[in-house]
Amino acid sequence: DTYVSVTKAGYIKRTSPRSFAASTLEEIGKRDDYRLIFVQTAKTTQHLLMFTTLGNVIYRPIHELADIRWKDIGEHLSQTITNFETNEEIIYAEVVDQFDDATTYFAATRLGQIKRVERKEFSPWRTYKSKSVKYAKLKDKTDQIVAVAPIKLDDVLLISQNGYALRFNIEEVPVVGSKAAGVKAMNLKAVDALQAAFICNTSSFYLLTQRGSLKRVSIEEIPATSRAKRGLQVLRELKNKPHRVFLAGAVAEQGFVGDLFSTEVEENDQTLLVQSNKGTIYESRLQDLNLSERTSNGSFISDTI
């Protein structure tokens, strides 16, 4: 076995269990722009898939990853992937056994498109060592992927920057080829954008605004309808200093195990760390938040923020 790690900025490596055990998770070799988004044990016979914010997927067999100590910086994807852009980031990564199963992913974009695509589309391609391939088509340079994850026949919840929420079943979204564009996910206003998309497999979700206000809302407050609608308001509009959605996601139930930034939450102790623009870090345990009304603006995480 080996430990595979991927950072948001695109540093990847595998590390021996011995090196991993001799360090803490925080001691990973890193640069200032680092955020670890994936770490998992894997066998050298398995495969790593990495999905980027620009709609590209990168493939690596685990045995081809550079074997690097936990405390040292990994290999940057731009060293080998010739079409890796300077503004490109990894949004989701996973280790897989095979490509011929029925796994399907959903991908949602900032400008309000959504699609489903099958894993078999990413069966290792001839030029994988030097080129990524498309998994989603973006509308223009301002567009990017806000969420991608494997999905079964669940509902998805979309939340826009201006505070609209829309829920529908993923069956409304056709399964298409990796290079195809998606369908309209949400009817966004001209000045709005999709900020979050996640699977409705828990009873509540959280929402953090750019002003530092946080709340937890019951999923039942957003009844399932159909795609391409505007949705329901989950923030009250203020004339002065309006709240805008900064981050949103599902709040885990007891007995799940997983990752706060995953679109499908499976974790039993979910803590949100928020860093202000002054560098102060605030900590909130999401399950401890009282349920708020759908249109409330939540509570500030600190009196001084």
Question: What would you call each of these model-derived segments?
Answer:
Residues 1-305:
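Short, structured "edge-of-domain" segments at secondary-structure transitions
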